[in-house]
C-alpha cells in the first residue's frame, strides 16, 4: 500500500507543482526568488517542528558539512528558478533538467574515477542528442518569435543563451552536490529527513540579498485579481493562491519521493521520477499550449529512451520476471 501511495503522491504532487509554477511564471516571469523563498521557509518550519524537535535534536551529520551542501543546494535552486526569467520556456526547462544523468556521469568520471559500460555511454549519448535537438529548436523559436526588430531578436537570443548557461551551471552544481551527499551518507549514514530540513533552513539568511526582489513581487502578487477558494470560501489574490498551492504540492512531491526511496529500489524511484517528468512535460505542452514541434518530440523521445536505458529497466524487468518462474519450478 505504501509504495502505491508514494507513487500517487509523486505524480499528484510533482505534476501539479509544475502546473502552479508555470501559472506563476506566465503572469510574472521574474517571480523565481519569491517562489524559492516560500518553498524553503515552509519546509524549514515543518522540519524545525517535526524533525529537529524545536532545535533540541542534535544533527547526526556535523553542521560544517551541511554548510557546504547548503551553499550548493541554495545556488542550484535560485539559478534554476531564475532561468525562467531568461527566455527559457517551461518545456525546455524540464527537458534540460533531465540531463542530470549526463552531469552525474561526467563528474563521476572526473571526481570519483568511475568507469561505465558501453551501454551506459550509449544511453547518455541519446540523452545528449535529445537535449541538443530540443535546445537548438528552441533557439530558432526564440529568434523567430521575438519582435520584428533585428536588435530585439538578437537581444532575446542573448538572454536565452544566458538562460541555457544558467541551466548548465545548475545541472553541474546539482551533480556535484549529489556526489558530496553520497560521500557524506557513506561516512555518517543516511539521514534524508534531517538533510531535507538543514538544506532548507540554513540558506534562509541568504534570501536577505534577494529581499528587494521578493518584496517587489509580493506587492505585485497583492495587486492580482481576487480569487475565492472553493469549499472554504476564503478570498485572496490569485497569485498568492498559486504560490500557496505551489508550496503545498512541492511538499507533497518531496514527501512522496522520500517514501518511495524508503519503500522501493533505486531503479523504481528513477523510473517513477522519469515517468513523472514525461507526464508533466506533456501536460505543460497540451494545457498551456507551449510551442512544441515534431523535432521537440523527437528530442524528448531520445531523452526518455536514454534515461530508461541508463537505469537498465528492461534488463531488470527481465530478471524480475524470470525469478518467479524459477521459484515455481523449484516448488
From Swiss-Prot:
It is a multi-pass membrane protein. The keyword Endoplasmic reticulum applies. It comes from the Eukaryota. The chain crosses the membrane at residues 4-24, 30-50, 59-79, 92-112, 117-137, 153-173, 201-221, 229-249, 251-267, 268-288, 291-311. GO terms for biological process: regulation of gluconeogenesis; UDP-N-acetylglucosamine transmembrane transport; UDP-xylose transmembrane transport. One of its GO terms (cellular component) is endoplasmic reticulum. A motif (Mediates endoplasmic reticulum retention) lies at residues 326-331. One of its GO terms (molecular function) is UDP-xylose transmembrane transporter activity. Keywords: Endoplasmic reticulum, Membrane, Sugar transport, Transmembrane, Transmembrane helix, Transport. Its main location: endoplasmic reticulum. It is found in: Endoplasmic reticulum membrane. It holds the Pfam family UAA. Belongs to the nucleotide-sugar transporter family. SLC35B subfamily. Antiporter that transports nucleotide sugars across the endoplasmic reticulum (ER) membrane in exchange for another nucleotide sugar. May couple UDP-alpha-D-glucuronate (UDP-GlcA) or UDP-alpha-D-xylose (UDP-Xyl) efflux to UDP-alpha-D-glucuronate (UDP-GlcA) influx into the ER lumen, which in turn stimulates glucuronidation and excretion of endobiotics and xenobiotics. This is Nucleotide sugar transporter SLC35B4. It comes from Homo sapiens (Human). The gene is SLC35B4.
Amino acid at each position: 500500500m505504501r509504495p502505491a501511495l508514494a507513487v500517487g503522491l509523486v505524480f499528484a504532487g510533482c505534476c501539479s507543482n509544475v502546473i502552479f509554477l508555470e501559472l506563476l511564471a506566465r503572469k510574472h516571469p521574474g517571480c523565481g526568488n519569491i517562489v524559492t523563498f516560500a518553498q524553503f521557509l515552509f519546509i524549514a518550519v515543518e522540519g524545525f517542528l517535526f524533525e529537529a524537535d524545536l532545535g533540541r535534536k542534535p544533527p547526526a551529520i556535523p553542521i560544517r558539512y551541511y554548510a557546504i551542501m547548503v551553499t550548493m543546494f541554495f545556488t542550484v535552486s535560485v539559478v534554476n528558478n531564475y532561468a525562467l526569467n531568461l527566455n527559457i520556456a517551461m518545456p525546455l526547462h524540464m527537458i534540460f533538467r533531465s540531463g542530470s544523468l549526463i552531469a552525474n556521469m561526467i563528474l563521476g568520471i572526473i571526481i570519483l574515477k568511475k568507469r561505465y559500460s558501453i551501454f551506459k555511454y550509449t544511453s547518455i549519448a541519446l540523452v545528449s542528442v535529445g537535449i541538443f535537438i530540443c535546445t537548438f529548436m528552441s533557439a530558432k523559436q526564440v529568434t523567430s518569435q521575438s519582435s520584428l526588430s533585428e536588435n530585439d531578436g538578437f537581444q532575446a537570443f542573448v538572454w536565452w543563451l544566458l538562460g541555457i548557461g544558467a541551466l548548465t551551471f545548475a545541472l553541474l552544481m546539482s551533480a556535484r552536490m549529489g556526489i558530496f551527499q553520497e560521500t557524506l551518507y557513506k561516512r555518517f549514514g543516511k539521514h534524508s529527513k534531517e538533510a531535507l530540513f538543514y538544506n532548507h533552513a540554513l540558506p534562509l539568511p541568504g534570501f536577505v540579498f534577494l529581499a528587494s526582489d521578493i518584496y517587489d513581487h509580493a506587492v505585485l502578487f497583492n495587486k492580482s485579481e481576487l480569487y475565492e477558494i472553493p469549499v472554504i470560501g476564503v478570498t485572496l489574490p490569485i497569485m498568492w493562491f498559486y504560490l500557496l498551492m505551489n508550496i503545498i504540492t512541492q511538499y507533497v512531491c518531496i514527501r512522496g519521493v522520500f517514501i518511495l526511496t524508503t519503500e522501493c529500489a533505486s531503479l523504481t524511484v528513477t523510473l517513477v521520477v522519469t515517468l513523472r517528468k514525461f507526464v508533466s512535460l506533456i501536460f505543460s505542452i497540451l494545457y498551456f499550449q507551449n510551442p512544441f514541434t515534431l523535432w521537440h518530440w523527437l528530442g524528448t523521445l531520445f531523452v526518455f529512451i536514454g534515461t530508461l536505458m541508463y537505469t537498465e529497466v528492461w534488463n531488470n524487468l527481465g530478471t524480475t520476471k524470470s525469478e518467479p518462474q524459477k521459484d515455481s519450478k523449484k516448488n
